[in-house]
Amino acid sequence: MTSPLCRAASANALPPQDQASTPSSRVKGREASGKPSHLRGKGTAQAWTPGRSKGGSFHRGAGKPSVHSQVAELHKKIQLLEGDRKAFFESSQWNIKKNQETISQLRKETKALELKLLDLLKGDEKVVQAVIREWKWEKPYLKNRTGQALEHLDHRLREKVKQQNALRHQVVLRQRRLEELQLQHSLRLLEMAEAQNRHTEVAKTMRNLENRLEKAQMKAQEAEHITSVYLQLKAYLMDESLNLENRLDSMEAEVVRTKHELEALHVVNQEALNARDIAKNQLQYLEETLVRERKKRERYISECKKRAEEKKLENERMERKTHREHLLLQSDDTIQDSLHAKEEELRQRWSMYQMEVIFGKVKDATGTDETHSLVRRFLAQGDTFAQLETLKSENEQTLVRLKQEKQQLQRELEDLKYSGEATLVSQQKLQAEAQERLKKEERRHAEAKDQLERALRAMQVAKDSLEHLASKLIHITVEDGRFAGKELDPQADNYVPNLLGLVEEKLLKLQAQLQGHDVQEMLCHIANREFLASLEGRLPEYNTRIALPLATSKDKFFDEESEEEDNEVVTRASLKIRSQKLIESHKKHRRSRRS
């Protein structure tokens, strides 16, 4: 959409014949020429004078009644625009007058504050007397302390100046906002007047603006809702932060205890892993040793067998040789006797060889080389066999007894089957009653458990509250109380009653101390101190206080010749710079607190 200034320039740039042929363009040009004059405010002139446009229109439109009607409409529009301009001029004059009144009032306040500062700087005694009159309860404390009284008063003065500057800044911002809203209102009125005669682009623009306004309102409502939710969350978190320290302490203690347990378990695990590795190495070494010894025994047995066979063959050859040699010399009787003796000797040797082979197999099977250990194993096997026989007999007796019990139970089952349905029904009723009683007991147990949990939660909340209250009253000491000089054990069973008694004694003592004082006056004093402390806490770290000298001359702080120059109002640029610095200091302070 083109601006009204562009349309006015294009309308003024047309030749005379084009202006006569397009009266609507001249109407738009005149409307546009009135709009920027309204926006520029006072002291601005219209694009052309009404007399010139009137004469020109009569000269060009002679004999055309439509031109007269257009001229009349243009006169009406010009009158409306002139009325809008006058209204805007009057509102601007009223704003200027109001601002001048505000400036004069602020000048008066500044002069009064300067006079007050001059009175305060006249002497130490006067300042001390003023401070003592203002704070009667601090009279013994500030009687002979002029420096501290001046510092305190200077601090109060600086705080008041800060509050005044903040209020001035808010007033300036609201005035600027009011001017912007008035300007927007005038623009909306002009656009509405123009939209009544034009139903094309301006109407579309109005609808778009209305849609945007509705969207902005919806977003604003949503933002307000989100803000309320965040405020509720903040309040909830503030309530939770009261008990957060105790919970954090308990959780930290639990974490430390768990870390110690984890370290101990790591040590035990490492020892177990080392023992496992050692056992594996020993087992592997024993297996390798066993395999080597077994192979060694097998080689030794095979060598012994070979030597025995060789000796046997040599003996047989020697026997055959001796038999052939003595065969001719001996008789048949002697030959038979020698044969019988040799046969007996061979049988004995063969039996000895068989016994050695069997004994070697037994050694291979048992893995022992000594005869005594082999005998002990066979004796142990005999004892084991006897124990197994005993267990076998006992198991047979148990089996017989169980068979008898089974037969007896089967007979009882048959008796129960044919004993009738009355017993079964009664047993079912008893079972149903027992189940109902069980359900009641379970419900009662669940209710008791819930009550116990609620009581435990209430006890925990009370304990946390009492601990918080005790931490607030830690500076109060009760010398003649029950708990004087005693330290309460949090792990003891009577910790909560003892803590309640201690808090009660401290509160009673505090109440007794407050009986002779004015409560309202003390509350006001505490509120002022908390406000000042909060302001001091919000200052950044690099902000330092410079103490003013006590003995100063009048010309050093108050110059009557430059009084007129000091009455000048702070400019908008300097006010913007100061407000920007103040906002940046607050942001830095918040970041430092978060970090």
From Swiss-Prot:
Keywords, in A-Z order: Cell projection, Ciliopathy, Cilium biogenesis/degradation, Coiled coil, Cytoplasm, Cytoskeleton, Kartagener syndrome, Primary ciliary dyskinesia
GO cellular component: axoneme; centriole; ciliary basal body; ciliary rootlet; ciliary tip; cilium; extracellular region; outer dynein arm docking complex
UniProt-annotated location(s): Cytoplasm, Cytoskeleton, Cilium basal body; Cytoplasm, Cytoskeleton, Microtubule organizing center, Centrosome, Centriole; Cytoplasm, Cytoskeleton, Cilium axoneme
Region (Disordered): 1-69
Coiled coil: 94-327, 385-473
Keyword set includes Oxidoreductase: no
GO biological process: brain development; cell morphogenesis; cerebrospinal fluid circulation; cilium movement; determination of heart left/right asymmetry; determination of left/right symmetry; epithelial cilium movement involved in determination of left/right asymmetry; flagellated sperm motility
KW Transcription (keyword) present: no
Domain of life: Eukaryota
UniProt xrefs under PANTHER family: COILED-COIL DOMAIN-CONTAINING PROTEIN 151 (PTHR46518), OUTER DYNEIN ARM-DOCKING COMPLEX SUBUNIT 3 (PTHR46518:SF1)
Disease: Ciliary dyskinesia, primary, 30: A disorder characterized by abnormalities of motile cilia. Respiratory infections leading to chronic inflammation and bronchiectasis are recurrent, due to defects in the respiratory cilia. Patients may exhibit randomization of left-right body asymmetry and situs inversus, due to dysfunction of monocilia at the embryonic node. Primary ciliary dyskinesia associated with situs inversus is referred to as Kartagener syndrome.
Subunit structure: Component of the outer dynein arm-docking complex along with ODAD1, ODAD2, ODAD4 and CLXN. Interacts with ODAD1. Interacts with PIERCE1 and PIERCE2; the interactions link the outer dynein arms docking complex (ODA-DC) to the internal microtubule inner proteins (MIP) in cilium axoneme.
Function comment: Component of the outer dynein arm-docking complex (ODA-DC) that mediates outer dynein arms (ODA) binding onto the doublet microtubule. Involved in mediating assembly of both ODAs and their axonemal docking complex onto ciliary microtubules.
Name of the protein in its database record: Outer dynein arm-docking complex subunit 3
